[in-house]
Swiss-Prot record:
Record Pfam families: Glycos_trans_3N, Glycos_transf_3, PYNP_C
Gene Ontology CC, one term: cytosol
Single GO biological process annotation from the record: pyrimidine nucleobase metabolic process
GO molecular function (one): 1,4-alpha-oligoglucan phosphorylase activity
PANTHER family per record: THYMIDINE PHOSPHORYLASE
Record's protein name: Putative thymidine phosphorylase
Length: 509
């Protein structure tokens, strides 16, 4: 310890049960000898020191001695894990020196263009948890007003280099990604085994849901373990040609996960940030060829073809600069894909398609085949235009199902729930008519209100899609929940607006 540290009061580290998201938070008593009112106040940024370790954190002050005593300092779970010093050790707390890169954030807010070095410094500090959520929000808001093409390239590069970077022995490593927003749409879990069964390498790292009722990782977790590290991931891919795992456990572009955790509550979703987010992870994952699915629809993230075209050009521009072959396709985003919304229901859809079951959702099957066809065309040994027929052959023959089972076995069994919620209710049509529109955003919110994805058995089973005729009172869908309070909340939400528009004799209603 330095002489200054020796002079400061030492506090005993204590673990406190506080959910602070990703942010490092420490708690001290208002009666603590270390609390100097002229220096510290609630939400101050402080530096914690113990031996040679340091940690930047946000300070909370408590009057509850049961939480932390006057001679203790409480660390939230993320802070304790990152500090890597056990409870009971002695530490000092002092005012934190702000990261130098914060000057770049202030410059961006003033409307200045940042250098590559400035952006790299921001991402470096951000990835090492030196920023508070408020400081991250300042960077995001400053960047949302404008971002030059040079800044976008620098941001993508810095984010890709901030965490684990994977390499593969194969010359062609393919991947696919959908920008999201469409309920169901669990095509990756069908595409990966088709492509892997053909022999191409497809190491799929997926996200967990943030604002949707299920991410690919949440759905795969119904079937298999997804918390897989980088070395184990490489072993699985070597044995199976592919995997479907949670990217957060591999530490690909960790700064992106931090940015997303602050973006979503603020409803910040700029095109530049989306491109940097997606491509930084694909570059870090070692992909050489990427297929991007951009759904377009009235309640999708992209509402027009023109908007999709602008985003496509942005993806292609950045991909070209980093040597990543990016192919972008627009797809129908007017309604959900598949019968189910929520992890268990979506996993059942996937296995029904792979198993060629008669009741399998035809839209999920067809879209997955078309996406897989594009990826298979990257195989130089496959004749041009043969991708679709090869994908269908692998699916119809059962080869894709066999490959999926191989991937599931390699990743290991899941400890998650695989049963549907035992509380359910139907939502019926208010009148006779034909379904003319479905609000994807509202159904996503309803499934989350029902408990998904935290409760994997919660969700929605769809009975009707656009173009289907319904009679008054006929079920449009069934909502599954695992908790009585969530059941009541979901029932109230569905009663207020069921998300369906019907065309009848008197027009839409």
């Amino acid at each position: 310890m330095s002489p200054a540290d020796t002079a400061r009061p030492q506090l005993k580290i204590r673990s406190v049960a506080l959910d602070t998201g990703r942010e490092n938070v420490v708690v001290i008593s208002r009666r603590s000898r270390a609390l100097r009112p002229e220096v510290f106040s609630g939400f101050s940024r402080v530096e914690l020191r113990c031996n040679s370790r340091t940690l930047l954190a946000t300070l909370l002050i408590t009057d509850d001695d049961a939480l932390v005593g006057p001679d203790e300092i409480g660390l939230s779970e993320p802070a304790l894990r990152r500090f890597a010093e056990p409870a009971g050790m002695l530490a000092t707390v002092s005012p934190a020196t702000p990261p130098e890169s914060l000057e770049a954030v202030r410059a961006k807010i003033r409307g200045e263009t940042l250098s590559d070095e400035a952006i790299a410094a921001v991402i470096e500090d951000l990835a090492h948890y030196r920023y508070s959520d408020m400081e991250i929000a300042a960077f995001l808001i400053g960047s949302a007003s404008f971002m030059t093409s040079g800044e976008l390239l620098a941001l993508t590069h810095a984010m890709a280099n901030a965490g684990t970077q994977l390499t593969w022995p194969e010359p062609v490593v393919v991947d696919k990604h959908c920008i999201g927003g469409i309920p169901g749409n669990r095509t990756s879990m069908v595409v990966v085994p088709i492509v892997a069964a053909h022999g191409l390498t497809i190491p799929k790292t997926s996200s967990r849901a943030i604002t949707s009722p299920a991410g690919t990782a949440d759905t795969m977790e119904v079937l298999a373990r997804v918390n897989v590290g980088a070395e184990e991931m490489k072993s699985i891919v070597a044995a199976c040609n592919g995997c479907v795992i949670w990217g957060g456990h591999v530490n690909l572009s960790p700064a992106d996960d931090i940015l997303i955790s602050v973006e979503r509550p603020l409803s910040l979703d700029t095109r530049e940030q989306m491109v940097a987010s997606i491509l930084s992870k694909k570059l870090a994952a070692g992909s050489t060829h990427l297929l991007l699915d951009l759904p377009v629809g009235p309640t999708a993230k992209l509402t027009s073809g023109a908007e999709a075209m602008r985003l496509r050009k942005l993806f292609e521009f950045v991909g070209d600069r980093f040597g990543l072959k990016v192919e972008v396709i627009t797809t129908d985003g007017r309604q959900p894909i598949g019968h189910g919304i929520g992890p268990v229901l979506e996993a059942r859809d996937v296995m029904a398609v792979l198993g060629n079951e008669p009741q399998a959702p035809a839209d999920l099957r067809e879209k997955s085949l078309r996406l897989a066809a594009h990826l298979l065309e990257y195989d130089p040994k496959l004749r041009g235009g043969a991708g679709y027929s090869r994908a269908r052959e692998l699916l119809d023959s059962g080869a894709a199902l066999k490959q999926m089972q191989k991937i599931i076995d390699a990743q290991g069994p899941s400890a998650g729930r695989s049963e549907l919620g035992d509380l359910a209710f139907d939502v019926g049509a208010a009148s006779d008519g034909v379904v003319s529109a479905i609000d994807c955003l509202r159904l996503n919110r309803l499934a989350r209100t029902a408990g998904a994805p935290v409760n994997k058995g919660a969700g929605i089973r769809l009975y009707k899609k656009i173009g289907d005729r319904v009679d008054q009172g006929e079920p449009l869908y069934r909502v599954f929940t695992c908790d009585p309070s969530e059941h009541d909340l979901a029932a109230a939400a569905a009663s207020a607006n069921n998300g369906y528009v019907l065309d009848g004799p008197n027009g839409p209603h």
